Regions:
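Solvent-exposed segments in extracellular or luminal domains encompassing
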Residues: 41-58
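Extracellular Ig-like/FN3 beta-sandwich strand-entry sites
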Residues: 18, 54-58, 128
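Proline-enriched interdomain boundary motifs that mark the N-terminal boundary
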Residues: 1-8
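Short, solvent-exposed loop/linker segments at the N-terminal edge
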Residues: 11-17
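C-terminal edge beta-strand
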Residues: 70-78
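Structural beta-strand segments of beta-rich domains
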Residues: 17-21, 82
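Feature for extracytoplasmic/surface-facing segments of secreted or surface-associated proteins
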Residues: 79-209
Length: 209
């Protein structure tokens, strides 16, 4: 039977970016691809492929020889990133994470980063709540030791804000957007115009509006 050595580098990649597939075989005279790639392949080689899907992207290589057929599959996990900004005045140097277990801490197993000098951050997206801890208020230059604000995410979007208002919504509102048991939304409760999306609205960038 043919034998196949088949690998992907890296095995986890941001979608719309590339990975390198490498393979070699013995006792084979032809190979073909299936799954997340396709076509006839040489019995040994490398190929750069784009990761297009979130979750598992499976690549299968099947090789044939006089002794029969053999297949091998490698899987690459595709993921997305979410951008955002921490605002109560922009907050730099805050630890920002996606809290997956709802303990309002940035555990070592959770994806985390530090907000930059404009309060901005970028994180690998998973389901959970954005939590910002500490940092420095860029308006007042006050160090916000252990200051915590959050944003309960209900799905993927490319940009999110973490503000005191999103923190209130995290505690008062359900995932369907109703709050405090009354069926009202957070905008109504806080007297904010319903045209404002509190989860993406940057209050500093829109001062005076």
């Amino acid at each position: 039977l043919p034998s196949i050595s088949f690998s992907a580098d890296p095995t986890s990649q941001l979608i719309n970016n590339n990975v390198t597939l490498s393979w070699s075989s013995s006792n084979a005279n032809s190979c073909s691809a299936s799954g997340s790639w396709s076509g006839t392949k040489t019995t040994a080689g490398t190929e750069i492929v784009q990761i297009t899907g979130v979750g598992n992207n499976s690549f299968t290589l099947s090789c044939s020889g006089s002794g029969g057929n053999r297949s091998s599959t490698v899987t690459v996990e595709g993921y997305r990133e979410t951008d955002g900004v921490v605002v109560d005045g922009y907050i730099s140097g805050a630890e920002v994470c996606i809290d997956e277990n709802s303990n309002f801490l940035c555990d070592s197993s959770e994806f985390s980063t530090t907000s930059d000098n404009d309060g901005k951050f970028k994180l690998r997206y998973v389901d959970g709540s954005l939590v910002s801890i500490g940092g420095t208020d860029l308006d007042s230059q006050i160090i916000l030791e252990n200051y915590l604000i959050s944003h309960k995410m209900t799905g993927y979007t490319e940009f999110k804000v973490v503000t005191p208002v999103t923190s209130v919504a995290s505690f008062l509102c359900t995932n369907n957007g109703t709050c405090d048991g009354s069926g009202a939304n957070i905008n109504t409760i806080l007297g904010i115009d319903n045209s404002v999306d509190i989860y993406t609205f940057d209050p500093v960038a829109n001062r005076g509006d």
